[in-house]
């Protein structure tokens, strides 16, 4: 398993998909067709709802800090947009590419994977925050 990020609150192993979670809370689904073939979904803040940021550390497989990434989310609370803790609605926009929506695991490491451009799965599991 590849460990990607750590955050600030959390709970047990769970799985969700973008199609299930996008559009909850203050997020709305956005569908984009790439090269007339591939379809990519991500979430964006609804009009009038402020986007907020949080900086988190990305860890390697040995729980050592690699770097920091900035996550953006909608609304006042980080849990907005995801209906089950420990997830928080976020989109990773630091690459400069189109934002990718996921619900991240607070205070626990998580693994993000996707089977195709329409179905995203995110799995949370318990772990320590890297220093």
Swiss-Prot record:
<keyword id="KW-0964">Secreted</keyword>
<dbReference type="GO" id="GO:0099106">
    <property type="term" value="F:ion channel regulator activity"/>
</dbReference>
<protein>
    <recommendedName>
        <fullName>Conotoxin Cal8.1</fullName>
    </recommendedName>
</protein>
<dbReference type="GO" id="GO:0090729">
    <property type="term" value="F:toxin activity"/>
</dbReference>
<keyword id="KW-0528">Neurotoxin</keyword>
<comment type="function">
    <text>Probable neurotoxin with unknown target. Possibly targets ion channels.</text>
</comment>
<feature type="signal peptide">
    <location>
        <begin position="1"/>
        <end position="19"/>
    </location>
</feature>
<keyword id="KW-0800">Toxin</keyword>
<keyword id="KW-0732">Signal</keyword>
<keyword id="KW-1015">Disulfide bond</keyword>
<keyword id="KW-0872">Ion channel impairing toxin</keyword>
<dbReference type="GO" id="GO:0005576">
    <property type="term" value="C:extracellular region"/>
</dbReference>
<feature type="propeptide">
    <location>
        <begin position="20"/>
        <end position="38"/>
    </location>
</feature>
């Amino acid at each position: 398993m590849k460990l990607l990020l750590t955050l600030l609150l959390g709970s047990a192993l769970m799985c969700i998909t973008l199609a299930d979670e996008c559009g909850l809370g203050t997020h709305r689904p956005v569908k984009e067709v790439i090269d007339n073939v591939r379809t990519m979904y991500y979430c964006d803040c609804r009009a009038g709802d402020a986007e907020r940021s949080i900086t988190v550390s990305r860890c390697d497989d040995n729980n050592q800090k690699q770097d920091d990434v900035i996550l953006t989310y909608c609304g006042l609370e980080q849990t907005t947009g995801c209906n089950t803790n420990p997830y928080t609605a976020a989109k990773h926009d630091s690459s400069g590419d189109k934002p990718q929506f996921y619900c991240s695991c607070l205070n626990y490491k998580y693994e993000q994977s996707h089977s195709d451009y329409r179905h995203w799965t995110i799995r949370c599991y318990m772990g320590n925050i890297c220093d």
